[in-house]
């Protein structure tokens, strides 16, 4: 095991690395939060800073450590502290959830400072119960460091619906308050996260969600070009007048993930039954406009594996497609 003195040296050196890179005008810095790594007699701080995620793929982390750490400062070979940095991020992101109060909403935040991607998802209490699992799944396949914000909504049907509509399931109608929700995101959530987590001004923002939150993400991207991408898993594209609205005011982002369960359109609800035809049409229209868009069919109905389906949506939206 590394002596306490050596652990302190490592922490100081990693802090020095972060400081140096924050003054690098050409590359953004990101850092994995502190976490003690136990295993194989090794105990070091996993506070490793380096340049953008691409650096993790070409060995920059190893190069940085080799320049800053000296064998005399360690009681074990230097190779033992050259860790798989992408794995570090995957492990750390799932255990670093924190609550940040933004306005009147307690937002749950995961991920890294100075991240290249900011992922936003409107959630209800039920989804929050599986959020750790969803974010861990995103991190497992992510090629880029990201900051993830789960933003709670109290009235799902009201806060995420773009306009008023009668109830289609049960007795709860739709209040049409999506404009207020979008204003809260753009004027409070995003600025707060950028400042608090040192996100670059040009951070790529992906708005995503499941069901009505997926529709909200699609609708929001008709109102602003702020979003780099949309991750819409099983979106409620059956919503009355949505397809006509999108034709008149098209989605502005160029990166759109769409998915649907292969049993979702097999419903006796005549309003919701159009979801399959609508999502096929929307996908075709977006492709015809030249958008980077995919439509994935998942096995099962609407309530199967919502967390994993949404994770796949965010993963795709962060990938580079040619």
Model-derived features with residue positions:
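Gly/Ala-rich beta-loop-alpha elbow adjacent to hydrolase catalytic centers
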Residues: 208-209, 213
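A domain-start/cap signature at the N-terminus of enzymes
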Residues: 22, 75-117, 146
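The feature captures the conserved acid-bearing segment of alpha/beta-hydrolase catalytic domains
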Residues: 237-305, 317
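Short, charge-rich patches within N-terminal targeting peptides
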Residues: 54-63
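Short glycine-enriched nucleophile-adjacent loop
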Residues: 214-223
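Serine-hydrolase catalytic machinery in alpha/beta-hydrolase-like enzymes
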Residues: 116-198
């Amino acid at each position: 095991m590394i002596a306490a003195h050596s652990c302190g040296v490592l922490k100081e050196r990693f802090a020095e690395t972060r400081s140096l890179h924050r003054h690098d005008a050409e590359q953004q810095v990101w850092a994995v939060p502190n976490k003690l790594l136990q295993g194989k007699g090794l105990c070091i701080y996993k506070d490793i800073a380096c340049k953008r995620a691409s650096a993790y793929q070409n060995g920059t982390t190893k190069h940085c450590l080799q320049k800053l750490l000296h064998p005399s400062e360690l009681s074990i070979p230097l190779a033992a502290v050259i860790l798989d940095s992408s794995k570090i991020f995957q492990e750390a992101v799932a255990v670093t959830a924190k609550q940040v109060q933004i306005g009147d909403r307690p937002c749950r935040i995961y991920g890294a400072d100075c991240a290249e991607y900011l992922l936003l998802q409107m959630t209800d209490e039920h989804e929050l119960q599986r959020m750790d699992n969803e974010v861990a799944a995103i991190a497992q396949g992510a090629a880029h460091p990201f900051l993830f914000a789960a933003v709670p909504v109290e009235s799902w049907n009201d806060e995420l619906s773009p306009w008023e509509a009668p109830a289609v399931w049960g007795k709860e109608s739709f209040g049409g308050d999506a404009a207020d929700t979008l204003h809260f995101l753009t004027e409070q959530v995003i600025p707060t996260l950028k400042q608090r987590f040192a996100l670059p001004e040009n951070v790529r923002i992906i708005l995503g969600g499941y069901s009505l939150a997926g529709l909200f993400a699609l609708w929001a991207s008709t109102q602003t070009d702020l979003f780099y991408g949309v991750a819409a898993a099983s979106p409620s594209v059956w919503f009355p007048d949505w397809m006509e609205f999108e034709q008149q005011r098209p989605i502005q982002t160029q990166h759109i993930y769409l998915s649907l369960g292969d049993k979702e359109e097999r419903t006796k609800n005549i309003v919701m039954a159009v979801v399959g035809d609508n999502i096929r049409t929307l996908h075709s229209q977006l492709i015809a406009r030249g958008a980077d868009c995919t439509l994935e069919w998942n096995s099962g109905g609407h309530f199967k594996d919502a967390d994993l389906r949404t994770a796949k949506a965010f993963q795709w939206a962060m990938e580079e497609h040619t």
